[in-house]
């Protein structure tokens, strides 16, 4: 049975600014695959998908400030519904 989750950045992280989508609506993403790029003003980071699935909706645009609890993207997964944790961005380079 498919279920949906909304990808969020972990609350322990500082606020970020959204830079770029790396996948578009309708794309399949794998576990750990980078779905977007964000910046903290000094460095850029990739945000990985915690589960494999189909991207169905983006909630942010270029330049948006991402605050604690903001959803970035909605992804549909196959299988039994499980809790999907917020992710920590991975520094580029």
What are these model-predicted stretches?
Residues 1-37, 46, 52, 86-93:
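Acidic, low-complexity mobile loops and tails
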Residues 52-67, 90-93:
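Short peripheral tails and domain-boundary helices/loops at the edges of structured domains
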Residues 29-46, 67-85:
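Short hydrophobic beta/alpha edge segments that flank linear recognition/processing sites
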């Amino acid at each position: 049975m498919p279920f949906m989750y909304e990808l969020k950045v972990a609350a322990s992280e500082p606020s970020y600014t959204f830079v770029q989508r790396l996948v578009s609506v309708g794309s399949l993403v794998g576990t750990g695959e980078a779905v977007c790029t964000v910046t903290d003003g000094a460095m850029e980071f990739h945000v990985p998908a915690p589960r494999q699935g189909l991207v169905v909706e983006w909630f942010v645009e270029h330049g948006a400030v991402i605050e604690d609890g903001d959803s970035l993207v909605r992804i549909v997964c196959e299988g039994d519904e499980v809790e999907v944790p917020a992710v920590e961005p991975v520094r580029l380079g």
